[in-house]
């Protein structure tokens, strides 16, 4: 179960980074600053977590179902962005409503990146015992700021074609949806 959650978290991070490749550098920088501030300011809440509490959360079926709903909504929005982006790229003039929906979805960075960043912060705090919690949090915040900014540029360089990035974003979101369904089952199978 924990392995599936870790793979889901990696996919959420990758999807977030891929989505940033469709935005302008200024908005990527703004999102990077927001994510870095989130990591730095979550230190007081992250130090209150315990490993047993996190294990209990992963074992809580109702919490996993609630998280799966949020994951499904985010994946649906990201896939809708991919389909609208292809529609805008391939057709001539588009309706204003379609263009408005495309722009709104392009600006939606995703909300699951924040729980993933929080989880990463908790993991780092547990990994560095004896080190100041705020030092760990703000060091991770600087790392997040640099990683989002540089990682987005690297992905644009690595995949310069917008269509290829859209296809990859769509496919990784589909994989995220499938893994979300698997994680929701949480060891319960329908055996009759």
Where are these regions (language model features)?
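Alpha-helical transmembrane segments of polytopic membrane proteins
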Residues: 1-8, 32-33, 65-80, 134-145
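N-terminal signal-anchor/start-transfer transmembrane helix
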Residues: 3-24
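Alpha-helical transmembrane segments and their helix-start/interface "positive-inside/aromatic belt" motifs
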Residues: 18-36, 159-171
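A generic, lipid-embedded transmembrane alpha helix
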Residues: 29-55, 115
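Hydrophobic alpha-helical transmembrane segments in multi-pass integral membrane proteins
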Residues: 43-50, 116-122, 176-192
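Alpha-helical transmembrane-segment detector that highlights a single hydrophobic TM helix
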Residues: 50-88
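Membrane-proximal helix-loop-helix units in multi-pass membrane proteins
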Residues: 85-149
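C-terminal transmembrane helix-loop-helix hairpin of multi-pass membrane proteins
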Residues: 135, 151-192
């Amino acid at each position: 179960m924990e392995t599936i959650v870790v793979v889901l978290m990696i996919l959420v991070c990758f999807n977030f980074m891929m989505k940033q490749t469709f935005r302008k550098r200024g908005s990527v920088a703004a999102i990077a600053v927001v994510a870095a501030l989130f990591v730095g300011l979550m230190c007081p809440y992250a130090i209150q977590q315990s490993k047993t509490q996190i294990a209990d959360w992963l074992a809580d079926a109702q919490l996993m179902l609630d998280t799966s709903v949020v994951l499904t909504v985010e994946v649906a929005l990201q896939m809708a962005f991919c389909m609208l982006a292809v529609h805008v790229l391939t057709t001539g003039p588009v309706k204003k409503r379609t263009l408005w929906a495309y722009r709104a979805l392009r600006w939606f960075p995703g909300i699951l990146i924040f729980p993933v960043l929080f989880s990463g912060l908790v993991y780092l705090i547990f990994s560095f015992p004896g080190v100041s919690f705020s030092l760990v949090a703000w060091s991770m915040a600087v790392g997040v700021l640099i990683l989002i900014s540089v990682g987005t540029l690297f992905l644009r360089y690595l995949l310069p074609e917008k269509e290829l990035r859209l296809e990859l974003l769509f496919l990784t979101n589909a994989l995220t949806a499938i893994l979300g369904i698997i994680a929701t089952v949480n060891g319960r199978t329908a055996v009759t």
